[in-house]
């Protein structure tokens, strides 16, 4: 279960966000998803579902969100596990990050990804084996 790149929640959210203020980010996200060999984590999928059905300006219906999630089944997905939780905590301590960001980094390592596309972490920073790239910067 390997992929060169891991996608963070915000990239997926922008790909389906229909609000005008995020239209340029939507295009970037859609183009990125169409052009790279990426993987995901269960955490990213969970965060995506909650965000697009409850938190964005024009929420998706639960059925629309489910349909999008079902299309992601073909990509490598790192499940949540006890080991991943522990490594997420270790990462949060080591890098002084919120736990959730530490867990995303742990999943990226497990996936074998060298690049994590995210706008939530420092663009260009190397966290162990994983470099963060902000596609919206």
Please describe what each predicted stretch is.
Residues 49-75:
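Active-site-proximal, substrate-binding regions of enzyme catalytic domains
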Residues 9, 42-50:
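Short, conserved active-site loops that position catalytic residues or coordinate cofactors/metal ions
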Residues 1-40, 55-63:
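Short, well-structured N-terminal submotif of metal-dependent ribonuclease cores
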């Amino acid at each position: 279960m390997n992929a060169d790149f891991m996608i963070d929640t915000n990239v997926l959210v922008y790909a389906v966000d229909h609000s005008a203020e995020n239209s340029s980010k939507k295009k970037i996200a859609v183009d990125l998803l169409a052009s790279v060999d990426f993987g995901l984590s269960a955490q990213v999928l969970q965060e995506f579902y909650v965000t697009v059905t409850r938190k964005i300006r024009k929420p998706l219906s639960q059925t629309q969100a489910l349909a999008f999630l079902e299309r992601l089944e073909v990509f490598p997905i790192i499940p949540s596990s006890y080991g991943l939780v522990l490594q997420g905590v270790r990462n949060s301590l080591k890098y002084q990050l919120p736990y959730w960001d530490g867990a995303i980094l742990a999943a990226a390592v497990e996936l074998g990804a060298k690049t994590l596309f995210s706008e939530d972490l420092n663009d260009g920073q190397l966290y162990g084996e994983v470099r963060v790239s902000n596609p919206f910067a």
